[in-house]
Amino acid sequence: MRNCRVLLVLVLSLVIVLNVVRASDESKVHIVYLGEKQHDDPEFVSESHHQMLSSLLGSKVDAHESMVYSYRHGFSGFAAKLTESQAKKLADSPEVVHVMADSFYELATTRTWDYLGLSVANPNNLLNDTNMGDQVIIGFIDTGVWPESESFNDNGVGPIPSHWKGGCESGEKFISTNCNRKLIGAKYFINGFLAENEGFNTTESRDYISARDFIGHGTHTASIAGGSFVPNISYKGLAGGNLRGGAPRARIAIYKACWYVDQLGAVACSSSDILKAMDESMHDGVDVLSLSLGAQIPLYPETDLRDRIATGAFHAVAKGIIVVCAGGNSGPAAQTVLNTAPWIITVAATTLDRSFPTPITLGNRKVILGQALYTGQELGFTSLVYPENAGFTNETFSGVCERLNLNPNRTMAGKVVLCFTTNTLFTAVSRAASYVKAAGGLGVIIARNPGYNLTPCRDDFPCVAIDYELGTDVLLYIRSTRSPVVKIQPSRTLVGQPVGTKVATFSSRGPNSISPAILKPDIGAPGVSILAATSPDSNSSVGGFDILAGTSMAAPVVAGVVALLKALHPNWSPAAFRSAIVTTAWRTDPFGEQIFAEGSSRKVADPFDYGGGIVNPEKAADPGLIYDMGPRDYILYLCSAGYNDSSITQLVGNVTVCSTPKTSVLDVNLPSITIPDLKDEVTLTRTVTNVGTVDSVYKVVVEPPLGIQVVVAPETLVFNSKTKNVSFTVRVSTTHKINTGFYFGNLIWTDSMHNVTIPVSVRTQILQNYYDEN
């Protein structure tokens, strides 16, 4: 068995582009994008790519050696090793939409599904109405899969869906028989990575040159969305229960495009490999595609083909595949949300109604409940210290967690140490623990910002997090007595009241930095302390399972819900699923309490934190009305975003001429209204489609943002057998006389059974394009 210390940041942080400096005349991988494929025969498409490359390089042999991938299923293009001058020649060709250099990226349950209302015990819910997602195929582009995991058993799973065209690719320690009726596909894509890293030693690499997962990230995400039933699973006794995915009878297809790099201690995902994985998934017949990947701020426009995920997702959505992406882990800062294309479902991360309280008992018998994943033995009353200079020595003392190593070892040896940190990185916890352990200490209590989810220590060393208020209480106790002592008990699992739901601190926030009128994220889902399968090679694996956090975990939650909805509504468009999820979302927690957003300071959550709210699977199954979108709507968006006619034509495969004047981006038929620069009154249009009772009457309810006037016409929508689509206008004006921040409200259509709700976000900008740093 291979062993490696894999830093948890890899599963908590979304994509970071790795800059590679090369000489300008050296060949490197470029992606040549040709737009929509012009022929249905993939062999014909590939041959055209080789001919184009042969014409450029002068011979078929050189073309063959240069070619990395031919994209021939979902769209047309290829990846090849080219010099800068060769790439420029291709870019000047009228057949070529865009040429871009390859780049490298890193990566971005037992309680989750009951929390979301999908209990197996209820025979009349979405889970059972859809036979648990049977016949729906979910594809994952990630780090691979551990096929022997119990989460991928095929007990009770029927025949492989007839529309599946993929297969299982053999490789290092992976053979085709590792697949079954649950795990029906597994492929790997490494050519782009190898072409850019010729020094990479595939023999000595600790990763598997196959679809087998080394670090466990891909296994974790796949088991969250579509894992089978596994009884009596816990993490060292915590978070125990019966484990399953959201759609436990859905089928799983794995596309490994991310590789562990020993020298970096990190994972890299080549753009060319990701695009090839997306291309293959379109050919293979996946219904839902889940990507826990993304880019870094600043983003490329969705209309810029350097946004590879948006480009691949466009073609997937055009073929009816629902694409779900993680929104990023750069929160709580505003304008950090990733994967913002309007054809992608972008997911924020929230907490569950579950926590792991860890009792801390002071010598004065006061009990404080911290948070940890401590599963070791109870630490009886032990000396407690806060390292500080009492003025009797010239030695250096520090109670700052990151500087505990500056203290003399005798200060911490045999004691529990209290420290404070303002550091928002998870490593502040693990490093503090390592410093105390190295000095012979017995435990550490870390006081930190109450809005930050610093990952608790992962071993059996007592390491407990509390907030500044409680930390100050502990410090005052230490200073009040000559011999302060403390007792630390193992963590426990607390579910339900009084644990509230929050948007996670790390979850990236809106508004959309590249297209502010497009609300992102779309939806929130549990992504904190999620227990799921992992690779046994992962250093934090316990029996092949692990607790992880990130929007990487939240995205497959939504992918699992979408798989159930796809089984119930097989003919819906990808936009219909997004609309159903957004318009029916929870804006309060299961106990009717407001959902807060963690950060400095904690506040009531708004659409920039979690879009429409937290995904509500049962309500999404019967939304009443949907805000549907198709190719025409996406073309409208592309035109309004400034893309030129020829590029749009090659992208969509049809001759496209944008109207003059261009249509407003505010008229894109999204299940949201976002106006980032309101000065004068604006009127926008939306169209809703009835997917509920044929004869229905809906009345409007407006909850306007503060200081904003919203008038809807008509105020009543009537549907019958002949009228299934109805348009309405929304007139928006402001009473504010100064530039403001965003204010939030809602527009609701109700027929007494359904409340079809879209968020309304408006910012008044009397002085346009003005940055106010005050």
UniProtKB/Swiss-Prot annotation:
Localization annotation: Secreted, Cell wall
Disruption phenotype: Transient delay during the first day of seed germination and increased length of the primary root.
EC number: 3.4.21.-
Domain PA residue range list: 383-478
GO BP of this protein: proteolysis
Residues of the active site: D142 (charge relay system), H217 (charge relay system), S552 (charge relay system)
Swiss-Prot/TrEMBL keywords: Cell wall, Glycoprotein, Growth regulation, Hydrolase, Protease, Secreted, Serine protease, Signal, Zymogen
CDD domains the record matches: PA_subtilisin_like, Peptidases_S8_3
Residues of the Inhibitor I9 domain: 29-108
One of the record's GO molecular function terms: serine-type endopeptidase activity
Propeptide feature: residues: 24-108
Signal peptide region: 1-23
Annotated glycan sites: N128, N201, N232, N394, N409, N539, N644, N654, N725, N755
Tissue specificity: Expressed in roots, leaves, stems, flower buds, developing siliques and mature seeds.
Main EC class the enzyme belongs to: hydrolase
Function as written in the Swiss-Prot or TrEMBL entry: Serine protease that cleaves the pectin methylesterase 17 (PME17) protein to release the PME17 mature form in the apoplasm.
Family: Belongs to the peptidase S8 family.
Name of the protein: Subtilisin-like protease SBT3.5
Gene it is expressed from: SBT3.5
